[in-house]
Amino acid sequence: MIVIVVGGGASGFFSAITCASTNKNAQVIILEKTDKLLSKVRVSGGGRCNVTNACETISEFAANYPRGKDVLEKAFSIFNNQSTIDWFKKRKVLLKTEHDGRIFPISDNSQTIVDCLIDEALKHHVQIKKRSAVTS
């Protein structure tokens, strides 16, 4: 089975990693139209990468996303902010919670998250193709 993931951002990488790690026979390929991977991750949180937020409930977490709150509540019931924290912890990326509830890598450097996502993708044999625009 060949799985194509369009976009080399955080969602694309996470989807590709999840697919490759749960479907050992899948050939997973990320297609990124530019020559830069995870560019929004690099600038998120002023270059520190705001990974997630420390919210008590799924409803509180979904409220941070004004469009599509109901859809997000359903998605967050499957994989939420604590799932994200646990996912990075399992990969030895330590996170910290700031007073306003934003969660960052302890390094205060988005490169920590970028490296983790790229390393995890390569560990699961995800192929990454830059400058590969999808036109139709």
Annotate each language-model stretch with its function:
Residues I2-I30:
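N-terminal Rossmann-like FAD-binding beta1-loop-alpha1 element of flavoenzymes
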Residues L72-Q82, H99-D119, K129:
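Short beta-strand to alpha-helix junction loop
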Residues I30, K96-T97, I128-K130:
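General beta-strand structural signal in soluble alpha/beta enzymes
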Residues G46-T97:
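Glycine-rich active-site loop/strand segments that organize a redox cofactor
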Residues K130-S136:
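A conserved short coil-to-beta-strand element within the FAD-binding core of flavoproteins
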